Amino acid sequence: MARIVVMGAGLGGMSAAYELREVLGKGHDITLVGKGGQFGFTPSNPWLAVGWRQQEQITLDVAGHVGKHGIAFNGDGVERIDADRDAVVTGGGERIPYDYLLVCTGPKLAFEEVPGTGPDGGFTQSVCTTPHAAHAWEAYQAFLQDPGPVVIGAVAGASCFGPAYE
């Protein structure tokens, strides 16, 4: 029996964990490690940002859903990989051993690379995460109270910003 750790509980990690369970059956331990207990369906973030969806319509509780498929979940995130001992160490200090490690962490947002960007203190909005999209909706509502010019675009180095233009 193999111990498989899937690092990242976003679109890639959730899909990978479910696919592994389906292909490998119940004979192997699969542990999904993500930061926080909520999964947000990223492709729906633009709809959240314009008010076509509510946050609860595009999020779900990870532990409850993966648990039904015999997949363990840890919501503390991975603090570090201990490759010498074949284990990940979570943000809560738990050491989770693995025989196989699948890294599905997704992008690391780097708004600090371009001054003035980012939803936290910048002059821009984002739909990269569900909380960002919810904040963008709130900012849009405030904008409607005092309208002005709008610029839509992406900064150099941005990847996969197509969904924002939907």
State where each predicted segment sits.
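Beta1-alpha1 glycine-rich phosphate/pyrophosphate-binding loop at the start
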Residues: 2-72, 156-166
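FAD-binding core/adjacent interface of flavoenzyme oxidoreductases
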Residues: 71-165
